[in-house]
């Protein structure tokens, strides 16, 4: 059986998740990228609880972007997730790229979150 691109992402994600673990002091910033949208969550893995979330499906974001599948949308989500995290008192996170390569939309989200004040 030939591996598809999706299979490769899933394999990489399993490898990454063995090493990346979020605590209450330093939660995990998880990124999921689909063909049409991008999603980001700040997760405390010890409590198995999502602390903060943002995606291109939200009304406030959707009205300001043309498409949820480009770097501009990722930059906005990165800024938004950082802003919401800082409001909740979360300054340090562990970045989980979700099996995707650190390139393009994932990289744009990460850099925007760093510029907005998150430390990782």
UniProtKB/Swiss-Prot annotation:
| Highest taxon listed in the record's lineage | Bacteria
Q: Does the keyword Cell cycle apply?
A: no
Q: Which UniProt keywords apply?
A: Ribonucleoprotein, Ribosomal protein, RNA-binding, rRNA-binding
GO BP annotation list: translation
Q: Which InterPro entries match?
A: Ribosomal_uL18_bac-type, Ribosomal_uL18_bac/euk
Q: Describe the task this protein carries out.
A: This is one of the proteins that bind and probably mediate the attachment of the 5S RNA into the large ribosomal subunit, where it forms part of the central protuberance.
- Record-stated family: Belongs to the universal ribosomal protein uL18 family.
What quaternary arrangement does the UniProt entry report?
Part of the 50S ribosomal subunit; part of the 5S rRNA/L5/L18/L25 subcomplex. Contacts the 5S and 23S rRNAs.
Q: Which HAMAP family match?
A: Ribosomal_uL18_B (MF_01337_B)
Q: Which NCBIfam families match?
A: L18_bact
The protein, known as: Large ribosomal subunit protein uL18
Give the species this sequence originates from.
Answer: Trichodesmium erythraeum (strain IMS101)
């Amino acid at each position: 059986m030939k591996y598809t691109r999706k299979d490769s992402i899933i394999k990489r994600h399993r490898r990454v998740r063995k090493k990346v673990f979020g605590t209450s002091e330093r939660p995990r910033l998880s990124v999921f990228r689909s063909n049409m949208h991008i999603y980001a969550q700040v997760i405390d893995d010890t409590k198995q609880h999502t602390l903060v979330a943002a995606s291109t499906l939200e009304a406030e974001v959707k009205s300001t972007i043309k498409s949820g599948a480009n770097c501009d949308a990722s930059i906005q989500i990165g800024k938004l997730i950082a802003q919401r995290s800082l409001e909740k008192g979360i300054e340090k996170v562990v970045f989980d790229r979700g099996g995707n390569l650190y390139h393009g939309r994932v990289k744009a989200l990460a850099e925007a979150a760093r510029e907005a004040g998150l430390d990782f």
